[in-house]
Structure formats: C-alpha cells, structure tokens
Amino acid sequence: MNKKSICLAVGLCLLTSTWAQKKSFGRKMEPINFSQVEITDNFWKPRLETHANTTLGVCINQCEYTTNRVKNFAIAAGVIPGKFEGLVYDDSDLYKMIEGVAYSLTNHRNDLLENKIDTIISYIAKAQKEDGYLMTYYLLGDMSQRWTDMDKHEMYCCGHLIEAAIAYD
C-alpha cells in the first residue's frame, strides 16, 4: 500500500468514527438497581423462590448448627463461653451466607430471615476489636499471630465481610 492509500484509509476511518459517535440510534441506556427488577419467567422465578424459601434456611442451619461458624462469633463476642472450632477460613462462609440472604431479602422480604441475620451481625459487631480486627480464628486463639501468615485467609475473609456489608445495606 502506498502512502496516499494509507492516509486515505486512516482519514476515512477517522471521519466515520467521528460521525458514529455523534449519531444517536435510540435511547440512552440507564442503569437501574436490581431491587427494581421483578423476575416473572417460568425458569428463574421458581428457582429464586426456592432459594428464598428453602436454600437460605439450609445455609443458615449449616452455619449455625452443623458447623460452629455462628458459635465462634458468639464466643468471640462474649455471648457464650467456648473456644474456636472449625476451619481457619470459616468466617468467610458465614459472610457469604449473609450476602446471599441480603440480596434475597431485597426482593423477597422475610422477617424471620432478617431477624436471624441481624442477630448474627450483632455477634460479628461485638466480636470486632477496637482496632477493627475481625477473624475468629485469631480472636479466639493467638492474637499475636494475626497478619503473620497470609495462608490463614485473613484478607480473603475480610473481602467477604466487605461484600456482605455492601449487600446488607
């Protein structure tokens, strides 16, 4: 290709891209909050209802009774006596459960679930140290070891806590 052809091709591209940017083909898209969306189809609606009415209750039961995830926070909050039991990253699973309930409550109000989550959140708030630190593995163990081993999932758990807090606005 010679220089004239290249210049002509570049000029044509610039001209058409400028025209396309100025030309509007329809309405501007406006974002909306998902709380303003109602799912009514035959595929997703029943699944979301099952999630709200069954799955979330099972998740809460798993965190509260099958594992010690809620209990660890109640112990760290001073509500009940005990010691840490479970996996080092168990806090994150509780936070993800809270996030799931929070998003579901946006479109499927359920006072029982909301009250249960509020109780769990009260344990979390009471367990948090004055400096903001919050991880039951260390709160109920050796606090001098916090932030010393990134394989212990402190940042991972913190990220899930933040996501849960955003969801449970």
Predicted regions: what they are:
Residues 1-22:
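Bacterial Sec-dependent N-terminal signal peptides
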Residues 21-169:
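Glycan-recognition and catalytic cores of secretory/periplasmic carbohydrate-active enzymes
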